[in-house]
């Protein structure tokens, strides 16, 4: 049994960490960190935890926390962990960071897109990008710092990764159109996220400027073995949770001048995902739906070949708070400590 501390336990991703870890047989939550609710009962903030969690919220003192737990989850805004992380802290505890502070390897790129100065760039190189299905062999018991991928990025990367890796699409033509529920914007009160602003409406935002763009480009670039530039456009939709990504790219023709067939593309997806518990490649003609993955750690993917245009449409769906945040963080923790990778994550998707 290990002890875990959560900084940001009262945000949506932090609360989802609590929900998941409560059912993990190898973990005890020892620290419910929340700068906003210090000394308040956790169950008073989240009523669904009434008579389940009997603990008060604590502060975000990383130095003290590192002395008392085996792993820290930082479900915090960008800049928090980078601003407090020291070698002394990392020498005592493993950290899974749900922010973007250590996802992007180039400091200048991070500072350009997030518009803040990176306070601890000396730890970027050692941070492992924790997209388990791709970097599983790098998340080991020796790893100290895991950069948990973003929600849009997890969905976008896993949806296209097999075809990028195998060189079956022209990456210069890749377009990612993604839609997310409002929980992706966090729990803080913001006028654009009020019920009357969001209900019965959809909108694009961060057009040509969303900060998950360089993260997607960097990871798919590693897969392709070259620099990649994409068009990424996110949209806000009036639902609580879920992300769906629809991605478009031109298929590369085979030597005989014909397009790859459905069976050939399906074989590529199966090559990468047939043995992945949390990635489900759907049957032919079935399009992913956010409702099918809600509350779970699954990613559903599929594709359609448009022979008329020579393009392929790739689709993916996940729960932004689970596989897009807390579930993936627990998956990484399991790898860090040598637990069964699926421990605590065998949640059946909720429906309806």
Predicted regions located by residue number:
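A short coil-to-beta-strand element that immediately follows conserved catalytic motifs
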Residues: 29, 171-176, 227-231, 278-283, ...
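Oxyanion-binding "anion nests"
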Residues: 209-232, 236-240, 244-246
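Conserved active-site and cofactor/substrate-binding residues in soluble primary-metabolism enzymes
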Residues: 12, 126, 154-158, 207-215, ...
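Short Gly/Pro-enriched turn/cap motifs at secondary-structure boundaries
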Residues: 204-208, 235-238, 290-293
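Short, solvent-exposed beta-strand edge segments and adjacent coil->beta transition regions
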Residues: 143, 202, 242-246, 311-313
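C-terminal active-site/capping subdomain that shapes the small-molecule cofactor and substrate pocket
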Residues: 248-352
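Generic secondary-structure signature for well-ordered alpha-helical cores
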Residues: 22-26, 165-169, 210, 218-225, ...
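N-terminal Rossmann-like NAD(P) cofactor-binding subdomain of oxidoreductases
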Residues: 1-200, 205-207, 304-307, 348-352
């Amino acid at each position: 049994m290990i002890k875990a501390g959560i900084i940001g336990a009262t945000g949506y991703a932090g609360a989802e960490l609590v929900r998941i870890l409560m059912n993990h047989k190898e973990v005890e939550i020892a620290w419910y960190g929340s700068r906003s609710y210090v000394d308040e009962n956790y169950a008073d903030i989240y009523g669904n935890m009434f008579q389940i969690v009997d603990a008060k919220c604590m502060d975000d003192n990383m130095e003290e926390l590192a002395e008392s737990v085996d792993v820290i989850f930082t479900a915090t805004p960008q800049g928090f962990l980078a601003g407090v992380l020291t070698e002394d802290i990392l020498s005592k505890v493993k950290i899974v960071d749900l922010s973007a502070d250590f996802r992007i390897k180039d400091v200048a790129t991070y500072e350009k897109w997030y518009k803040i100065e990176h306070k601890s760039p000396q730890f970027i190189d050692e941070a492992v990008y924790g997209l388990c299905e791709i970097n599983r062999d790098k998340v080991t018991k020796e790893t100290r710092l895991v950069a948990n991928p973003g929600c849009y990025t997890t969905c976008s990367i896993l949806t296209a990764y097999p075809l990028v890796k195998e060189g079956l699409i022209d990456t210069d033509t890749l377009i990612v159109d993604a839609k997310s529920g409002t929980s992706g914007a966090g729990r803080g009160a913001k006028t654009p996220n009020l019920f009357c602003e969001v209900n019965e409406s959809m909108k694009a935002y961060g057009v040509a400027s969303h900060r998950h763009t360089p993260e997607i480009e960097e990871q798919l670039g590693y897969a392709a073995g070259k620099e990649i530039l994409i068009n990424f456009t996110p949209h806000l939709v009036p639902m609580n949770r879920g992300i769906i990504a629809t991605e478009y790219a031109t298929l590369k023709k085979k030597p005989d001048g014909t397009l790859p067939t459905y069976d050939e593309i399906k074989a590529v997806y199966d090559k990468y995902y047939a043995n992945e518990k949390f990635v489900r490649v759907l049957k032919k003609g079935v399009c992913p739906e956010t409702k099918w993955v809600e509350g779970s750690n699954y990613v559903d993917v599929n594709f359609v070949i448009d022979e008329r245009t020579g393009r392929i449409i790739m689709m993916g769906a996940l729960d932004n708070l689970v596989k897009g945040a807390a579930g993936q963080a627990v998956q990484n923790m399991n790898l860090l400590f040598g637990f069964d990778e699926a421990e605590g994550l065998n949640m059946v998707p909720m429906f309806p």
